[in-house]
From Swiss-Prot:
A GO molecular function held by the record: chitin binding
Species of origin: Passalora fulva (Tomato leaf mold)
Binding site for chitin: 51, 53, 76, 78, 179, 181, 183, 205-206, 208
Protein name: Secreted LysM effector ECP6
Domain notes: The LysM (lysin motif) domains are small globular domains involved in binding chitin in eukaryotes. ECP6 contains 3 LysM domains.
Length: 228
């Protein structure tokens, strides 16, 4: 799932300088009006660090306009070295129609593990609760030592509420392959992004490399005991 395929999870990331190819007589680059109001397209070669957000901003385009023109299957993934057609200078850019908004968590505990999480740069309790698929209130309730939920420190260890009578069927090592994202691994192996992050605190999810080894919990669930 991810080598030098860029992590654009949440479609966020720093913009970097890429390669802009001049307009040609290629039919894909011909001057024509688009849904976003652009009358010109350019070819752009994706470089390390690019995201659709940064590219759209660079050329005053729309994330979903780029997705549409290039028929991209997943707006969260763009391949290093790929050539994209970019409708530039959009008067009505579309940055929402192709981006799904995750549902608010309703669970109050995490099945299996872990019981704690170490804060890293950029974390907020809101984002952490979403990564673990639990409500913000349940995370705050499990950490009464935190006086201000909006003020957490890098390196601080917080409690993650774990469901009683729950387990992960396996916790083992996994080697990253091309295209891997924590969000996809979580869905495939029935765990959460937060659980993967907690067990790989020194791993940057946006800089995964092919062959990199991570710890991966699998099939995390509540366990029901049959009544005789």
């Amino acid at each position: 799932m991810q080598s030098m395929i860029l992590f654009a999870a949440a479609l966020m990331g720093a913009a970097v300088n890429g390669f802009v190819l001049p307009r040609t007589d290629d039919p894909d680059c011909e001057t024509k009006a688009t849904d976003c109001g652009s009358t010109s397209n350019i070819k752009y070669t994706v470089v390390k660090g690019d995201t659709l957000t940064s590219i759209a901003k660079k050329f005053k385009s729309g994330i979903c306009n780029i997705v549409s023109v290039n028929k991209l299957a997943n707006p969260n993934l763009i391949e290093l070295g790929a050539t994209l057609i970019i409708p530039e200078n959009c008067s009505n850019p579309d940055n929402k129609s192709c981006v799904s908004t995750p549902a608010e968590p309703t669970e109050t505990c995490v099945p299996g593990l872990p019981g704690s999480y170490t804060i890293v740069s950029g974390d907020t309790l809101t984002n952490i609760s979403q990564d673990f698929n639990i409500t913000l209130d349940s995370l705050i309730a499990a950490n009464t030592q935190i006086e201000n939920p909006d003020a957490i420190d890098v390196g601080q260890i917080i409690t993650v509420p774990v469901c009683p009578s729950s387990q992960c069927e396996a916790v083992g090592t996994y080697n990253i392959v091309a295209g891997d994202l924590f969000v996809d691994l979580a869905a495939t192996y029935h765990t959460t992004i937060g659980q993967i992050k907690a067990l790989n605190n020194n791993v940057n999810p946006s800089k995964l490399k092919v062959g990199q080894q991570i710890i991966l919990p699998q099939d995390c669930k509540n366990v029901t005991t049959a009544v005789a």
